[in-house]
UniProtKB/Swiss-Prot annotation:
It comes from Mycobacterium tuberculosis (strain ATCC 25618 / H37Rv). Catalyzes C-C bond formation between the carbons ortho to the phenolic hydroxyl of cyclo(L-tyr-L-tyr) (cYY) producing mycocyclosin. Can also use cyclo(L-Tyr-L-Phe) (cYF), cyclo(L-Tyr-L-Trp) (cYW) and cyclo(L-Tyr-L-3,4-dihydroxyphenylalanine) (cY-DOPA) as substrate. Belongs to the cytochrome P450 family. It is found in: Cytoplasm. Heme binds at R286, H343, C345. This is Mycocyclosin synthase.
Amino acid sequence: MTATVLLEVPFSARGDRIPDAVAELRTREPIRKVRTITGAEAWLVSSYALCTQVLEDRRFSMKETAAAGAPRLNALTVPPEVVNNMGNIADAGLRKAVMKAITPKAPGLEQFLRDTANSLLDNLITEGAPADLRNDFADPLATALHCKVLGIPQEDGPKLFRSLSIAFMSSADPIPAAKINWDRDIEYMAGILENPNITTGLMGELSRLRKDPAYSHVSDELFATIGVTFFGAGVISTGSFLTTALISLIQRPQLRNLLHEKPELIPAGVEELLRINLSFADGLPRLATADIQVGDVLVRKGELVLVLLEGANFDPEHFPNPGSIELDRPNPTSHLAFGRGQHFCPGSALGRRHAQIGIEALLKKMPGVDLAVPIDQLVWRTRFQRRIPERLPVLW
């Protein structure tokens, strides 16, 4: 008897086209055993129905994926307890304060985003084409936004950003540099909490709560961790999404022209760009804490399950004509780009506004934006938790 050869994930590092294997799996085997880069076996779910089942069932735990001996999607780049960061925040009684601080409705925040986007684009126009929309627009805009929301100096953003190229690696083996960067960034945020000049944003609020006797049970480590994780996860998610959204938009000149002519349609456009977004390179990992029936498979306690977002978001059973961007879908926000259930992304509203304002500013300044190289010449980062091109060269 020959052993079954397991499919290896991820299928592709490219964020501009969905692998053919996704549709085939969703049709034939919406739950299928695969092998991760660590050599561990996992169940890959690829239909909308099964993906939502796993994300909404609390017996599939994100926290337990970091447990000692658990099958791994990839090596941890943060301390194990940080995997359950939002759970730790809620347990400490800090969720309300954090959510209030990261709303895009904070006074002056949207104008700050517009001003920053316009300034970045003006610099690119002054320098002339070709311009790099990832390194000189999407990522700096995301970095500036999160410095503003955190209430930390803008000049500190690039230093913190440099940690992310290692923090979000997808490696089979431990990454020594990740701990070095983590310890340095924690030390930075601890210093921010002690800085009397930091009075605004999330860190200003955490600094006040840290001195409140009602929060004496919360460790300084957790207060600092909130700052580090919010910056890291927020910047990498918003920056990579805007980058891949711009690629999708450039590939669809009719949509680009429509959103330029009718900017009021940009929110609907962003929702569809979120749905077809391929920036999340690996399936969302969950560990079964009980035996659970998923489709035709009984997932056993202790087994790893991977939720394939592009499988769900391109499922024609839920989104007819899934490869087409349709601004009048009846269920526009039911995609899983921000997850689902207890780990739904807390920064979803902020991420939407970042993309909406960034795209609106770009189309005003560069209405004819186009790739400056053939799309197959884009170099996609490999072994990374996000699908991003190293550069996004454009002309206009």
